[in-house]
Amino acid sequence: MAGPVSLRELLMGASAWLGSESPGGPSAEGGGNAAGTPEPPWREDEICVVGIFGKTALRLNSEKFSLVNTVCDRQVFPLFHHQDPGDPGTGIKTKAVSVGEAGGAGDPGAAAGDSLRGGMATAEGNRAEPGPQDFSLLQAYYNQESKVLYLILTSICDNSQLLRACRALQSGEAGGGLSLPHAETHEFWKHQEKLQCLSLLYLFSVCHILLLVHPTCSFDITYDRVFRALDGLRQKVLPLLKTAIKDCPVGKDWKLNCRPCPPRLLFLFQLNGALKVEPPRSQDTAHPDKPKKHSPKRRLQHALEDQIYRIFRKSRVLTNQSINCLFTVPANQAFVYIVPGSQEEDPIGMLLDQLRSHCTVKDPESLLVPAPLSGPRRYQAMRQHSRQQLSFHIDSSTSSSSGQLVDFTLREFLWQHVELVLSKKGFDDSVGRNPQPSHFELPTYQKWISAAAKLYEVAIDGKEEDLGSPTGELTSKILSSIKVLEGFLDIDTKFSENRCQKALPMAHSAYQSNLPHNYTMTVHKNQLAQALRVYSQHARGPAFHKYAMQLHEDCYKFWSNGHQLCEERSLTDQHCVHKFHSLPKSGEKPEADRNPPVLYHNSRARSTGACNCGRKQAPRDDPFDIKAANYDFYQLLEEKCCGKLDHINFPVFEPSTPDPAPAKNEPSPAPPDSDAEKLKEKEPQTQGESTSLSLALSLGQSTDSLGTYPADPQAGGDNPEVHGQGEGKSEKRPNLVDRQASTVEYLPGMLHSNCPKGLLPKFSSWSLVKLGPAKSYNFHTGLDQQGFVPGTNYLMPWDIVIRTRAEDEGDLDTNSWPAPNKAIPGKRSAVVMGRGRRRDDIARAFVGFEYEDSRGRRFMCSGPDKVMKVMGSGPKESALKALNSDMPLYILSSSQGRGLKPHYAQLMRLFVVVPDAPLQIILMPQVQPGPPPCPVFYPEKQEITLPPDGLWVLRFPYAYVTERGPCFPPKENVQLMSYKVLRGVLKAVTQ
């Protein structure tokens, strides 16, 4: 053979002349066959097959290819490999070169090599190259002179292929363009180990002798589990391999055992200069003494042999009967060889020294070179003489004298085993009392090619996707059998799984610590995070993610299996205390024994609330829906208390079909800042109204001169400016029911600023009740209702200037009212305030903002964050401050409990005493129960005119709900003024 080729190339090229061979027998040596492909001249040679595998270091002199160069005494593989980054192999010749050296292996082999590579070109064109995930490569070289076929395995244990695999991981080729996580990366490397084991299994099935090359002088204990894995895999796939070679022209024992003989395994260790024998100082280094009988190198070899044999015997890789073993080692021959380290660290310097020695003739060399030689012949003789020195760092054999033992060269070490094969003696490595002879067969090159090609096709090169063919079926079965390797090779995963399995119970305990019987999703996530922290402290390795996912599943199963608390929260932000349950349907009774139970929501929180008018209090359950919160509770008290009182009913949905549908939760067509614009429009108007009322009261003028209020068209006002301003203001004020309400769709929640127009709810969350006439309220005693904190049951006075024409009022121009805080031109304020008045110029109304907490305690507030305290016969403060401000929806209760959490009271009622006077008081409540973008809530009728001479009570909603969910009450450390009743809740218009 001219040079090394890939084994796949060799086998596929040989199949060309093997497949076209006539049944009559082989053609003449060197002749052509029917296909025109020349046959190799060594096809009938009986060959010894030597396989080389192992690991390589970063040093140049530790390459496995240099060993073949040394044994063959020629440069079969190049000393330097200029490898393309995309080249799959190292040192592969894709084009044959003729070797014309002496030794008889050149010219015929070159021709055969050309024919082989030429004959396989078509076959390779029909088959895709091996996938990028397989980094194992087999190369072959046949030395015709020694009749030895060398098979060299290059895998991820070699630097070149390991570098390619790392680049593939770094660039994302192994993960489909994405970087792989730790577990997948570990799986990638283990998959490469399994593919390497398949290549090793092939070598152990076709070789007589195997050389294990290791870059150090210590035995790698991981080979023990690799060989045990290979032994188990071989026993698993042996029936499949028998099927593959049953028609090959080999012996019966070969077909039965799927190998020519139990291969003999030899070990080659690299010393790397760690053990050197220095000559004495007085001794000339050019003439060293002969080695001692027991040199350190020989003692190290013997120690390694004993260690390796003892390890393999303990692990049952080697047994007494060699026929049952994966490989054998000789009992009376050396099977360990130590390659000494190189003294030349620089390969360039080594080559220069060799070139210098070839070109320089010294006296000792001139004696060895014949005198008549000159020119090229003299150079060839010198090169032949110095070839012994350039032995690829393999020491030469030293002469023996006085019976001293000498060290073998690598060729001598290997050839003592090769000669046993070529002489057909075989290996008798069985030990024990009754050793059984093992089979042995020395095949010809043609027979070996036939069997090796079949095994290569099913074990390495078979196409898994072609399951219809017999080869594809065998390949798929072999690939499925490599799972037997996991128990031997994946020690890291086995350790990681054991470690993670021990950490899992600790994580479960951390999850279940301090857990109530039923708990919510939030508690589940918090406990799961704690369990994962405990798990991550103890779990390690590639199985970390797998058991972390199992921890997730286990905790979720524990939670959902009878420990899941109902996730529903009440409108006051309290959790339902029942475990996971379903709600009763219409007409269905609750059943606690069903799975899941059928129950109503219950938070076990109870509060005390008053009815619509406030005269009667009753306990109430924590509501979970808006109807129970704002309608059902008050309807029950209506029958007992305020059912006979006068009501102003708010418009609600009146269906025109038997099955009305709720409106879909669509966003409001209004612009996003509509609420803010409305508030901006309302604030100056309300502030102007309140300020003008205050100034009018202090200056003694009527509201007829206040242009900020819209005049009542029925009042017959004579000021065109007042009418114009009033119309402009009324146009800006939003009116959500400016068109006829829908009778098909209803609003499922409450009416607010983001609701679509024309929709009404089925019930109103607001209530407006008349307690009695205006005189039913006593200014000195306050409201006579239960639940009020003493001194807080009073309404604040609101003095409203009504229009009355005095006798001496003619000198005043009502159309020219001075600016605020400025006196009337030409007159003093004190004079104006006390002149020209009658008792009916001022009408007194009363206003009260009532707050109620969950314990039923009630109190009035005279302003924002100011609880009313009346010590005498009535309040002294005016209602103007409260009417001119945004009143908080929630305020700290006047009597806090013993707990650390603050206790809030909620604005629940607005009391208004409308006097019997020529004026109108318009009610316009607007509530924003949260910070922006919380919408503004208002009743179904936005402006309600309160009839005169009455004590009216506006009951606010208990809870505020939008289509996105409830607006929960404030929690700790929250600005309470973000929850407010907007200013301008009351407006007075004189008639």
Swiss-Prot record:
Bias type Polar residues, positions: 685-706
Modified residues (Phosphoserine): S115, S469, S668, S742, S895
Entries under InterPro entries matching the protein: SMG8-like
Annotated Basic and acidic residues bias: 278-289, 675-684, 720-736
Chain intervals for the UniProt region annotation (Disordered): 18-41, 100-129, 278-299, 653-738
GO BP annotations listed: nuclear-transcribed mRNA catabolic process, nonsense-mediated decay; regulation of protein kinase activity
Residue stretches of biased makeup (Basic residues): 290-299
Modified positions (Omega-N-methylarginine) in chain numbering: R898
Oligomeric form and interacting partners: Component of the SMG1C complex composed of SMG1, SMG8 and SMG9; the recruitment of SMG8 to SMG1 N-terminus induces a large conformational change in the SMG1 C-terminal head domain containing the catalytic domain. Forms heterodimers with SMG9; this assembly form may represent a SMG1C intermediate form.
PANTHER family noted in UniProt: AMPLIFIED IN BREAST CANCER 2-RELATED, NONSENSE-MEDIATED MRNA DECAY FACTOR SMG8
Function: Involved in nonsense-mediated decay (NMD) of mRNAs containing premature stop codons. Is recruited by release factors to stalled ribosomes together with SMG1 and SMG9 (forming the SMG1C protein kinase complex) and, in the SMG1C complex, is required to mediate the recruitment of SMG1 to the ribosome:SURF complex and to suppress SMG1 kinase activity until the ribosome:SURF complex locates the exon junction complex (EJC). Acts as a regulator of kinase activity.
Family under the similarity heading: Belongs to the SMG8 family.
Record protein name field: Nonsense-mediated mRNA decay factor SMG8
Organism: Mus musculus
Encoding gene per record: Smg8
